[in-house]
């Protein structure tokens, strides 16, 4: 199957449909940054335990934060076609609501030739998975939802912010 007619923007696919790692050796190095969020909907009782350090496995937010930061550094090992990047900064924070925890990867930064969206996506995903692991004995109905890129900057494609984009969903 030839793909050039419908997938000119899919850089990880050759025209015959096989996957390959994109050659970034000729790209110009620049500062790259990405910001993401994820929602974790759960029982309010779990959130009460979370804020009072009452979870059986310990401090869930600390574990999730560190796991998210570590995930940024391991992205190329988990996502085969991602280039390994020197991560300069990774910030993972949480906003507690009445029935949800919002995981925010406020900044993943690098100085390199490719973006850090995949590293930020991996950070919020792994942080959320760690929260789920720590809550699952109490709330089996928790839902991970709405993982999305909020903003990115740097590189040839320039800056993008969901808050100012016409592509809001």
UniProtKB/Swiss-Prot annotation:
Q: How does it assemble?
A: Homohexamer; trimer of dimers.
Q: Which residues form the active site?
A: 133
Q: Which reaction does it catalyse?
A: (8S)-3',8-cyclo-7,8-dihydroguanosine 5'-triphosphate = cyclic pyranopterin phosphate + diphosphate
What EC class is this? Answer: lyase
Record: residues binding substrate: 81-83, 118-119
Cite the Gene3D superfamilies for this sequence. Molybdopterin cofactor biosynthesis C (MoaC) domain
Q: In which pathway does it act?
A: Cofactor biosynthesis; molybdopterin biosynthesis
Q: Which InterPro entries match?
A: MoaC, MoaC_bact/euk, MoaC_sf, MoCo_biosynth_MoaA/MoaC, Mopterin_CF_biosynth-C_dom
This chain belongs to which protein, by name? Cyclic pyranopterin monophosphate synthase
Output the PANTHER family linked to this UniProt entry: MOLYBDOPTERIN COFACTOR SYNTHESIS PROTEIN A
Q: Which UniProt keywords apply?
A: Lyase, Molybdenum cofactor biosynthesis, Plasmid
